[in-house]
Amino acid sequence: MIQMQTNLDVADNSGARRVMCIKVLGGSKRKYAHVGDIIVVSVKEAIPRGRVKKGDVMKAVVVRTAKDIRRVDGSVIRFDRNAAVLINNKRAQSWDQTIALSIARRNEGYTHSQHSNQREGGERIQAQPSPPHARRAVKTSFCR
């Protein structure tokens, strides 16, 4: 669960290393964000020649949380740290980003087309289980 003042790691190559949540989007009374939710963040730490600078305010999609994620089959997914991917105001990335992450929720609509669990015709693809330590570098655009 991500709330205001939560520090998150950045899981892309935008140049930001650490961000802080300043608002959870989705209603005036909404307190917590989970995997797949959009939040407003402030960049707290960035590399010197990155695309973003310290103090920039951007939107981000939460991709990993330390809170348990329960799946319908009864399995539980948990990460060591909270992480997010920076996006622009139109819910798409403003540049090509390489993201190293394990996809925690495939049904949120924020996964790359080659990693989604549904084909164009609507038939479901049987997802192959991957070990929890497996990480993939994915070139994506986060559009619904």
From Swiss-Prot:
Keyword check for Ribonucleoprotein: yes
Q: Where is this region: Disordered?
A: 107-144
Name the protein family.
Belongs to the universal ribosomal protein uL14 family.
User: Looking at the record's lineage, which domain of life comes first?
Assistant: Bacteria
Is the keyword RNA-binding assigned to this protein? yes
PROSITE patterns membership: RIBOSOMAL_L14
GO terms in the biological process aspect are: translation
**Listed GO CC annotations:** cytosolic large ribosomal subunit
Q: Which GO terms describe its molecular function?
A: large ribosomal subunit rRNA binding; structural constituent of ribosome
Q: How does it assemble?
A: Part of the 50S ribosomal subunit. Forms a cluster with proteins L3 and L19. In the 70S ribosome, L14 and L19 interact and together make contacts with the 16S rRNA in bridges B5 and B8.
> By its UniProt entry, which InterPro entries does this protein fall under?
Ribosomal_uL14, Ribosomal_uL14_bac-type, Ribosomal_uL14_CS, Ribosomal_uL14_sf
Q: What does this protein do?
A: Binds to 23S rRNA. Forms part of two intersubunit bridges in the 70S ribosome.
Its protein name is: Large ribosomal subunit protein uL14
UniProt keywords (A-Z) are: Ribonucleoprotein, Ribosomal protein, RNA-binding, rRNA-binding
Protein's organism:
Xanthobacter autotrophicus (strain ATCC BAA-1158 / Py2)
Task: Tell me which Pfam families the record gives.
Answer: Ribosomal_L14
